[in-house]
A protein has these predicted regions:
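Small/aliphatic-rich secondary-structure junction motif
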Residues: 1-61, 76, 83, 157, ...
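Conserved phosphate-coordination/catalytic loops
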Residues: 11, 62, 119-123
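Gly/Ser-rich helix-loop-strand patches that form or flank binding pockets
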Residues: 17, 117-174
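A structural micro-motif
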Residues: 29, 113, 160-161
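Short, surface-exposed alpha-helical segments at coil->helix boundaries
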Residues: 57, 61-72, 100
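Structural beta-alpha unit
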Residues: 73-140
Length: 177
């Protein structure tokens, strides 16, 4: 089973990540955590590429890497990744670019073999739909956004089972989890 956990920020995605990890552990599922950043204009793609190269030489992180680093720390605190990787720290230097819109970090999991952190850029719905279609996820776990329209659009346009985490209280016991 393959699970995609969509996070958007450190401030609001904690419950989504917590539930996603619990579900992944329960099913021993291959897990991917994705953050979709703002869309980069076609006119500025080359400039953004040059800027990212320059940022690397200056030791700046590209937008969204902080969210992936936060997810990595959460995975480490919950022993979801191998101890050797935890000791080495977040591997931002091994962020693999797959096209102009997708970068990925591969991790070795303790509960399952594959744990990936993905950073995509573009329209949230289109990028998540593309990720689900190309990687064949069985379940996508998303947070209950304050924007009802966005959750509705995801459910309508993404061809995957969708688990919506809304009003999750980590101190409460849930029968399903």
């Amino acid at each position: 089973m393959k699970i995609l956990i969509a996070v958007g920020s450190k401030e609001y995605s904690g419950p989504t990540l917590q539930v996603g990890i619990k579900v992944a552990k329960a099913f021993n599922a291959s897990t991917t955590i994705v953050d979709v950043g703002e869309k980069v204009s076609e006119f500025s793609t080359k400039v953004v590429g040059l800027t990212q190269e320059r940022m690397e030489s200056w030791d700046f992180d590209r937008p969204g890497v902080d969210v992936l680093e936060w997810a990595f720390k959460y995975l480490a605190e919950n022993n979801f990744i191998e101890p050797q990787q935890i000791e080495a720290g977040f591997p931002k230097t091994t962020l693999v670019e797959k096209d102009g819109r997708r970068a990925e970090v591969y991790l070795k999991g303790t509960v399952c073999d594959d744990v990936n952190l993905i950073l995509r850029n573009g329209d949230i719905i289109a990028e998540l739909r593309d990720e689900v279609q190309t990687e064949f996820y069985d379940v996508m776990i998303i947070g209950g956004s304050g924007k009802r329209r966005m959750v509705h659009d995801m459910i309508q346009y993404i061809d995957s089972s969708i688990f919506v985490v809304k009003n999750y209280d980590p101190s409460q016991e849930y029968q399903i989890l």
